[in-house]
Every structure is written in C-alpha cells, then in structure tokens.
C-alpha cells in the first residue's frame, strides 16, 4: 500500500487537476459552451483516475486490517454519501430555464463588450481623422515653404557682375593669405627640424660619453671616489641635459625605469638569492628598497630645490620665473645630487622595516648599487612637469588590471594582492608603466600572518654592540661610471 500511496504522491495528476481548475476558472466566460464541457470532461477523467487509485489504496488498507476491520468506518462515511448520491436528480437535471438564463446573461455580457469595443474603434477612428487633417495641413505648409525657398534661390542666383568681381577679389586675397601662412608654417617646421637635429647630436654625444664611462667602469682599474662639494654651485652646468626637452627626458627616464626592472632588479635578486632561499622574501626586499629609494630621493629633491631657490632668488633676473630657473639649474647639475646620503637613508629604513626577515650574514649594502640607480632615476623624475612617481601600495589591496600585471606563479582568479614585486609608475592619476604583483587567495590573511611572523626576524638586531656598530658604520660602495641623467 505504501508504494501505491508514494506513486500517487509523486504523480502530477492532483497538481494538474488543480491547474486545470484554475485555468478553467480564468477562461470560463471567454470559452464557448463546447469548450467548457470539454474541460469539464477532462477534469472528470482526471478525477476518476485519482479516485481509482484512492479506491485501490482503500481496498489494500482494508485487507491489511483483517476480514472485518474498518467496516464501521466505511458504513459511517460512505452510506450517507451513497444515499445523497442516489437521491440526486436524474442526468437531465439541467432545466431549460437554467439554460435560458445562462444564455441571456452571456448575451448581455457579449453585447456590453461589443458596445465597448465599438466605442473604442470609433474614438480611434476620430483621432485618426484628426491626425490626417493635421498631416494635410503640415503638407500644405511644407509646400508653401518649398515655394518660398525656390523663389529665394532664384533671386540668389541672379547675382550681378559687380558681386562676382568682388567675390573673385576676395578669393585672390584669401589665396595670398594662405600662401603666407604656408610659408610661415614651413619656417616653423624647419626650425623644429633644426632643434631636433641639435637634440639628436646632443643625445649622440651623450651616448658616446656614456659608452666610454661604461667601458672605463668595466676596466680592472680601482674605483675612484670623487669628493662632494658642500655648495650646490661648485660644478658647472651640464649642457647636454639642460638642452633636452621635457618630453625627451621623460621618455629617457621611463626607458631607464624599465631597464632597471628588466636588468638591475634581476641582478640584485640573483645576488640576494645566494644568501636567502625564499624568493618571496627576496622580491619583497627589492620592492621595499625601490619604494624607500623613491621616498628618499623625493625628500632630497625638495631640500636641494630649497637650497637652489634660496641661492638664486637675490640675483634672479630675466623673463622666466624663479621656479623655472631653479628647475633648469637642477636639470643642468644633476651630478650635484648626493646620492650616497639617500642610499644610506634607504638602508637605515630597511634595517628597521618589520616586513623583512633575512639571515644575520646578509647586509643591504649588497644591493647598494641597485638602490643608487633607483634613487638617481627617482630624483630626476622630480624635475619633470608634472613629475613622475610610483603608486601607493598596500599588501592585501584589490588587484587592478590597469595598474599591475600578475606574475607567472600567481593565482589568476584571486582578487587580492599577496605582495608587490615592482611598483607602477604614475603621472598624476595616469598609469605610465604597469607594475607587477603576486595574487593569491587569502592574501589579506597571509599578509597579516607574515607581519606577525616578521616581528621576530631571522636576523637578530641585538647580537652584540660591536656588531651593530660595525653595520651602522659600514660604507656603501659607489659604482663609478654609472650613467646619470
């Protein structure tokens, strides 16, 4: 019996019977008499099938209870119902009066709906006639406007000989002005060509100078240390850098920034990998060194500009502003920048950075050459208008495709940055060069755990007083012959 009841429960007949009843209730007044009778017959058929299964369940249930089980229940429930059924009217119970009444009500409803539809059609017809009349009126007005236009065009074509001569004279004058403008533009183009040729020659000479410096730096001769002058005006201006346009200097700096990422960064990474096996920590060290180098170079540029402005302001004369004169002087004397002080500041800041952990035998002086190059480029970028700077970064920030590229070992579906490999170069709010970042799922939680672990780094900062003294006084080597901007 349980199987029969389960099949009845899973069957769609009861639900289909209810759906058909709902649909019949909605469409009863729209359907015809035959359609309503057909729907009623379908419902009776479905009901008979459901009743057949219910009677089968009733029979099985009674058999399970024994020979006389359930007799009283069946008598009390079915005998009154069977008596009521037998006392009902015969199959011809629908009298003619009910059919007549139903027919009259349907006719009244149909006549009402027909009149309503007829009124709607008449209103639409009247509105269409009004629109047609308005269109005809617009057509007449358009024809009148067309006639007026034709008349005016005919009058315009009847120009006199004097007007034609005047137009010809104006045409000759316009041609002469155009020729003068073309000559002026040609002169301007020639002047720009001469400037570009001069710039190319300057760049060529500077390239030869840089090549000679590079060849001397590769020679086995000892490194020469040049002493820095205390005054920013102790050296003469560099004419090659001063004559370059801002766009050319920006292009060179962007190229040098990309070259540092492609070459110097990898050299520093290879050098650190000899002592630190963790590639993630090595990349973090290089990224933090780059960020600190930009910060130190910007601070040094502000101080240098204040000193130059203070020195030039008493004797400044000429059409250009004092700020332009200061920038021109800095561009022409970039070698006066004390890059070694910035390198020392960067190394000091990295020694107390809580995100870095490394063995005690490793010193950041190993990558002082890389820091030196980044400081030079960052300092020179401040002389541009507008200056170039790196983007602000936070571990666990949302990854942005327009600002960073994912590394090859990143999880490309991860939305957060695990750590940054290289910063993005910005001009105001515009991305000039994309940076590089590692994305992993759970980056925010991993960054928090890495901070908590780095609170006790592998390298102990309190080994001995002598060790700290040696590290604080250890000089950073300078690279001679390094190209400067």
From Swiss-Prot:
Keywords: Coiled coil, Cytoplasm, Lipid-binding, Membrane, Mitochondrion, Mitochondrion outer membrane. Its main location: cytoplasm. Residues 214-244, 451-485 are annotated as: Disordered. One of its GO terms (cellular component) is cytoplasm. InterPro entries: MIEAP, MIEAP_C. Residues 112-210 form a coiled coil. It is found in: Cytoplasm; Mitochondrion outer membrane; Mitochondrion matrix. Disulfide bonds: none annotated. One of its GO terms (biological process) is mitophagy by internal vacuole formation. Residues 214-241, 471-485 have a biased composition (Low complexity). It holds the Pfam family MIEAP. GO terms for molecular function: cardiolipin binding. Key regulator of mitochondrial quality that mediates the repairing or degradation of unhealthy mitochondria in response to mitochondrial damage. Mediator of mitochondrial protein catabolic process (also named MALM) by mediating the degradation of damaged proteins inside mitochondria by promoting the accumulation in the mitochondrial matrix of hydrolases that are characteristic of the lysosomal lumen. Belongs to the MIEAP family. This is Mitochondria-eating protein. It comes from Xenopus laevis. The gene is spata18.
């Amino acid at each position: 019996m349980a199987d029969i009841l389960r099949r009845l429960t899973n069957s769609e007949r009861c639900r289909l019977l209810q759906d058909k009843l709902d649909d019949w209730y909605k469409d009863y007044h729209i359907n015809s008499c035959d359609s309503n009778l057909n729907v009623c017959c379908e419902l009776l058929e479905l009901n008979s099938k459901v009743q057949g299964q219910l009677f089968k369940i009733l029979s099985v249930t009674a058999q399970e209870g024994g020979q006389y089980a359930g007799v009283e229940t069946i008598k009390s429930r079915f005998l009154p119902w069977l008596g009521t059924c037998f006392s009902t009217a015969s199959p011809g119970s629908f009298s003619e009066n009910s059919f007549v009444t139903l027919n009259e009500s349907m006719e009244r409803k149909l006549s009402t709906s027909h009149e309503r539809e007829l009124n709607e059609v008449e209103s639409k017809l009247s509105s269409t006639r009004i629109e047609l009349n308005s269109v005809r009126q617009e057509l007449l007005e358009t024809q009148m406007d067309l006639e007026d236009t034709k008349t005016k065009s005919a009058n315009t074509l009847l120009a006199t000989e004097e007007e034609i001569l005047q137009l010809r004279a104006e045409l000759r004058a316009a041609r002469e002005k155009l020729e003068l403008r073309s000559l002026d533009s040609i002169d301007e183009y020639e002047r720009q060509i001469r400037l570009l040729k001069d710039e190319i020659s300057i760049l060529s000479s500077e390239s030869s100078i840089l090549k000679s410096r590079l060849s001397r730096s590769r020679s086995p001769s000892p490194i020469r240390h040049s002493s820095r002058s205390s005054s920013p005006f102790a050296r003469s201006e560099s004419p090659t850098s001063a004559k370059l346009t801002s766009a050319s200097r920006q292009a060179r700096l962007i190229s040098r920034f990309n070259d540092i990422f492609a070459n110097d960064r990898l050299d520093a990474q290879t050098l650190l990998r000899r002592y630190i096996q963790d590639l993630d920590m090595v990349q973090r060290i290089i990224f933090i060194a780059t960020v600190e180098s930009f910060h130190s170079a910007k601070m040094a540029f502000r101080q240098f500009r204040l000193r130059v402005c203070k020195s030039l302001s008493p004797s400044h004369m000429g059409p250009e502003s004092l700020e332009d004169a200061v920038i021109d002087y800095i561009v022409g004397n970039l070698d006066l920048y004390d890059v070694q002080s910035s390198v020392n500041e960067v190394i000091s800041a990295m020694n107390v950075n809580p995100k870095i952990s490394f063995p005690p035998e490793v010193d950041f002086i190993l990558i002082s050459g890389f820091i030196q190059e980044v400081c030079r480029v960052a300092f020179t970028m401040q002389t541009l208008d507008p200056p170039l700077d790196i983007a602000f970064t936070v571990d666990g920030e949302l990854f942005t495709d327009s600002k960073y590229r994912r590394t090859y070992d990143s999880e490309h579906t991860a939305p957060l940055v695990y750590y940054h490999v290289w910063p993005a170069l910005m001009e105001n709010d515009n991305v000039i060069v994309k940076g590089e970042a590692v994305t992993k799922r759970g980056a925010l939680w991993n960054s928090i755990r890495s901070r908590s672990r780095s609170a006790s780094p592998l390298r102990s900062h309190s080994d001995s007083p002598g060790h700290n003294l040696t590290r604080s006084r250890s000089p950073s080597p300078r690279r001679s012959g390094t190209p400067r901007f």
